[in-house]
From Swiss-Prot:
It catalyses: tRNA(His) + L-histidine + ATP = L-histidyl-tRNA(His) + AMP + diphosphate + H(+). Homodimer. GO terms for cellular component: cytoplasm. NCBIfam families: hisS (TIGR00442). One of its GO terms (molecular function) is ATP binding. CDD domains: HisRS-like_core, HisRS_anticodon. Keywords: Aminoacyl-tRNA synthetase, ATP-binding, Cytoplasm, Ligase, Nucleotide-binding, Protein biosynthesis. This is Histidine--tRNA ligase. Its EC number is 6.1.1.21. One of its GO terms (biological process) is histidyl-tRNA aminoacylation. The gene is hisS. It comes from Bacillus licheniformis (strain ATCC 14580 / DSM 13 / JCM 2505 / CCUG 7422 / NBRC 12200 / NCIMB 9375 / NCTC 10341 / NRRL NRS-1264 / Gibson 46).
């Protein structure tokens, strides 16, 4: 009996994994330029971390988490997102005590949500995200957004749309919450069952409803922008000013909310309007969360971050027909003729690889013609032929895989020759 991977997961095979490495390399290099440092947190955490951090009323906590009891009955959950773990680590490891703030972190890794599998959406999916914790300067909001946009641009995307909103401070959100209840309570029976619960528990969440039947009702919703106090208005204006100064175009959408409860002030999404998608598709989202460290038992440390789906980034590259991460082939393939040459090539191959040269030999006892075919399939820059005659003469015949030019190289000079001619 064979085995298949679980529904909602995928194998990332050679040929495809190079594309992942390409975008992950861009993400890491961009983070280095912005001085964000990598953090690696456990794949599972105590369930309460997410129920308190993400929000009891969210779809993630209510419907989508992979939760299980360990052998001692403790409730654990596979992480559905990265912010809660990063903030927990910030508090637990007292990163707030570092003399230079904000603490700038990034992560790349798998997350888990029990969602309906569909194109570009998996139950195990990969996110790249950043968190800047310890500053409530609007400039850091602009920096976080700029970093996300930079990653997409460097990866090769051009059909991007940035949408921003302000969720205001606690006072502003309370006023807006009351306005939403007053406006929609008389029509509560017209909403889907989920939104009926949300209106009572967390009214802002109804604006994030994906049900078509509710969209017409939500068009009449009171705008959060009408309920921002002066401090929140000034903060949002400053964020917009910085984005304009940087040269990043954006749209303000007063109905934009994020699906997690911890957000306040700035919220944003980056979308692709590439024709290959057929519809505008959200690639990344994030925002400010100024109370999360205190929720986790730490000191007040305002934060902001984002998460982007690696799968959706790659899908966006496909939608724009951008080819990335192609296998560039190997530096050298050694064709061996006879047992002595094969025996010698094993140690020679080791020396080449230790010198940083990608090289391969035949392990299937193929004849010379078959070995040359393998070299072609591996897109070898150079094909070296080694037989008993070459060994007796202390040399190796080298063919340029592109031009076909051939020459005899002394075995003592072979590594130096390859390093000189394959270094980019």
């Amino acid at each position: 009996m064979g085995f298949n991977i679980p529904r909602g997961t995928q194998d990332i095979l050679p040929g495809e994994s190079e594309r992942w490495q390409y975008v992950e390399k861009i993400a890491r290099e961009t983070c280095h330029a912005y001085q964000y440092k990598e953090i690696r947190t456990p794949i599972f955490e105590h369930t309460e971390l997410f129920s308190r951090g993400v929000g009891e009323s969210t779809d993630i906590v209510q419907k989508e988490m992979y939760t299980f009891a360990d052998k001692k009955g403790r409730s654990l959950t596979l992480r559905p997102e990265g912010t809660a773990s990063a903030v927990r680590s910030f508090v637990e490891n007292k990163l707030f005590a570092n003399p230079v703030q904000p603490t700038k972190l990034y992560y790349i890794g798998p997350m888990f949500r029990y969602e309906r599998p569909q194109t570009g959406r998996y139950r195990q999916f990969y996110q790249f995200g950043i968190e800047a914790i310890g500053s409530n300067d609007p400039a850091i909001d602009a920096e976080v957004i700029a970093l996300a946009m930079s990653v997409y641009r460097k990866a090769g995307l051009s059909n991007l749309k940035l949408v921003i909103n302000s969720l205001g401070d606690k006072e502003s959100r309370t006023a807006h919450r009351e306005a939403l209840i007053r406006h929609f309570e008389p029509r509560i029976d017209e909403f889907c069952s989920d939104c009926q619960k949300r209106l009572r528990q967390n009214p802002l969440r109804i604006l994030d409803c994906k049900k078509d039947r509710d969209h017409e009702l939500l068009k009449t919703a009171p705008s959060i922008l009408d309920y921002l106090n002066e401090e929140s208005k000034a903060y949002f204006a400053k964020v917009q000013q910085y984005l304009t100064d940087i040269g990043i175009a954006f749209e303000v959408d007063p109905n934009l909310v994020r699906g997690l409860d911890y957000y306040n002030h700035t919220a944003f999404e980056i979308m692709s309007n590439a024709e290959g998608f057929g519809a505008i598709t959200t690639l990344a989202g994030g925002g400010r969360y100024d109370g999360l460290t205190e929720e986790f038992g730490g000191p007040k440390a305002p934060g902001i971050g984002f998460a982007m789906s690696i799968e959706r980034l790659l899908a966006a590259l496909d939608a724009e027909n951008v080819k990335v991460g192609a296998d560039e082939g190997i530096d050298c393939y050694i064709v061996t003729l006879g047992d002595k040459a094969k025996d010698y090539s094993v140690s020679l191959l080791y020396k080449l690889r230790e010198a940083g040269i990608s090289a391969e030999i035949d392990y299937e006892q193929k004849k010379m013609k078959g070995q040359f075919k393998s070299a072609d399939r591996l897109n070898a820059k150079y094909i070296a032929v080694l037989g008993e005659d070459e060994l007796n003469q202390n040399q190796i015949n080298v063919k340029d895989g592109k031009t076909g030019d051939q020459q005899a190289i002394g075995l003592d000079d072979f590594i130096r020759f390859l390093k000189t001619n394959t270094e980019s």
